[in-house]
């Protein structure tokens, strides 16, 4: 019940923020029409070319805004996902900790050619939506986290990982980057970030519903369409994924845990100015469970309420 309540609270908050951003971006229009307007602004040259073009700018923002240190010269490639790995729109393939000289590749899946032309076009995200995906997968999401974890002195944290940490961190960076200046206050960029947040919110609620409350796949798909504003293709993919991956609630769960830890750790250490130091220390442990990192970072002297999720 506590897990579900935390997820519902964050879903409601993100919906409210989306309504506010849409009122600025498309005054007088419905939220649905606002989202359609954002989605219609497709990346120039297609989704792969668009994602590739976003990488230098995102890396520079990480550097200029002191988001986190970049501990190595590696960069991620961007390519179309192979046919056997198109069950999700995007993912990054990162070499294991014992590999050397192998590149990381950010893969993007094209729409299913068997879908209608309308559904294929709707599947391709808008520029702002894709920007949040690129943040998640590369800078400063999974790829930057990999650069740190492969250099950690913590062998256990380097060789073993947790779903909540890896996906929680990558999802956390989407909102954090916008809060830190990505988009310079452009409501379209905020809407793109919120669409990704709502997608993860509905994953969270679907995981609980499908596996503990008798929710059907059709009901999950409807929730993705109505609460996360997903097109048919993405909604059907996401609902189906929930049947075999109940752990996909860890995107939102991990993000909420990191937000709580960041707020607790930076209080008295400079607040927003300490985000870079927080991120470097957080990433220095490898990929262990977030509650263990919380113990290490806050120490025995921390006199907070003991909660690991925001109130």
Task: Please place each PLM-identified region on the residue numbering.
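Long, His/Glu/Asp-enriched segments that create or flank divalent metal/ion-associated functional microenvironments
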Residues: 9-16, 34-311
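Structured, charged N-terminal subsegments at the starts of enzyme catalytic cores
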Residues: 1-32
């Amino acid at each position: 019940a506590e897990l579900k309540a935390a997820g519902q609270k964050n879903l409601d908050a993100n919906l409210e923020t989306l309504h506010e951003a849409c009122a600025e971006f498309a005054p007088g229009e419905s939220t649905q029409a606002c989202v359609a307007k954002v989605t219609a602004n497709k990346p120039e040259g297609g989704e792969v070319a668009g994602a590739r073009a976003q990488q230098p700018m995102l890396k520079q923002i990480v550097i200029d805004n002191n988001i986190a240190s970049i501990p190595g010269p590696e960069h991620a490639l961007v390519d179309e996902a192979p046919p056997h790995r198109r069950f999700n729109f995007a993912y990054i393939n990162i070499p294991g900790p014992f590999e050397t000289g192998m590149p990381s590749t950010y893969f993007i899946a094209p729409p299913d050619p068997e879908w209608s032309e309308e559904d294929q076009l709707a599947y391709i995200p808008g520029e702002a939506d894709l920007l949040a995906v690129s943040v998640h997968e590369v800078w400063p999401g999974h790829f930057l986290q990999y650069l740190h974890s492969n250099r950690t002195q913590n062998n256990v944290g380097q060789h073993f990982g947790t779903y909540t940490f890896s996906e929680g961190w990558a999802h956390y960076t989407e909102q954090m980057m916008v809060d830190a200046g990505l988009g310079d206050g452009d409501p379209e960029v905020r809407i793109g970030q919120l669409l990704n947040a709502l997608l993860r919110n509905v994953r969270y609620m679907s995981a609980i519903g499908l596996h503990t409350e008798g929710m059907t796949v059709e009901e999950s798909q409807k929730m993705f369409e109505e609460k996360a504003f997903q097109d048919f293709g993405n909604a059907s993919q996401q609902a189906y994924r929930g049947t075999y991956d109940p752990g996909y609630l860890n995107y939102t769960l991990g993000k909420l845990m990191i937000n709580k830890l960041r707020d607790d750790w930076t209080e008295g250490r400079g607040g927003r100015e300490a985000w870079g130091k927080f991120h470097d220390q957080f990433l220095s442990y490898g990929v262990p469970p977030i509650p263990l990192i919380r113990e290490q970072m806050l120490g025995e002297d921390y006199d907070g309420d003991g909660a690991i999720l925001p109130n």
